[in-house]
Amino acid sequence: YCTQNSISFSCGIITNGTLLNNYVLQQLSKHNCNMVQITLDGMPEAHNSRRPYKNGNPSFNDVIDSIKKVLAYPKINAVIRINIDKTNINDTDTLLKYLGKYGENLTCASIDFGIVRSSTSACSSYAGNCFADSEISDVLEHLWNELQVNGFAYTPRPMQRWMFCGLYSDSQFTVTPDCSVYKCWEHAGFEQHRVGTIDSEGNLINKTYAFYDWMTRDPLENHECRECVYLPVCGGGCGSVSYNQSKTYHAPGCFKTKGVVEKQILHFVNEKIKTNVEVKK
């Protein structure tokens, strides 16, 4: 369809990595997939306790092998997603050393840290293991430093962001196996958040009120957001956080911004100063 209509198309996938092989990577590349994100939640003990196979067998070694396959494959970028909470934060330093230049030397991969949150009713019992908003900036700053120590090229830099998430655009959706459509994947399966369905020709039909409610979210209409100095780098925050806290998409959805931006700026400036000093030497 895209070729016939001269539309540029690329995609990426998020996967646990256990089914990746050279044939799968070949097919992904053939269909313009340029990014594969694989989740790794700690060293073997921590990861295998969180992400075992259905039969209980460990998956850590298979995931590492899959990451290596992606790194060896041309035209596909590898992203390692590490989900962080209080139960595995101490394990993460060891993991970064294992992945880095002193271990498996997978430094060509990008690292993405996910802050675990108890964002749904099913996850509410896990809240005690999640970091408070006031703790996130210090946690991330420490992890950024560990990335650089272990040979990963990473310099956090605040960016102007009119939308907190791409799911506020008119071209990104979450589609479940029954062809129901949602905007945020955290809402998949919750009827009140379903925005429509996909018909046999791939069209979005049966749009619900939730679609228009989500798409009309405007942080400038919210007094707290409108007066907030973080708005240009936040875009009003996460709609899922907003709904979970206030039962509406139209409230502030502050997450991973306040306190983090300051750390990003300091980290970025310090790296620039260090680079300039080294160049002058």
Where on the chain are the PLM-derived regions?
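Radical SAM enzyme [4Fe-4S]-AdoMet core and its adjacent flexible, acidic
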Residues: 45-68, 72-170, 178, 194
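Radical SAM enzyme core and accessory elements
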Residues: 178, 220-281
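Short loop/turn motifs at secondary-structure junctions
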Residues: 7, 32, 74, 105-107, ...
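C-terminal accessory region of radical SAM enzymes
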Residues: 132-160, 186-232
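Canonical radical SAM enzyme core domain
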Residues: 1-46, 53-62, 82-94
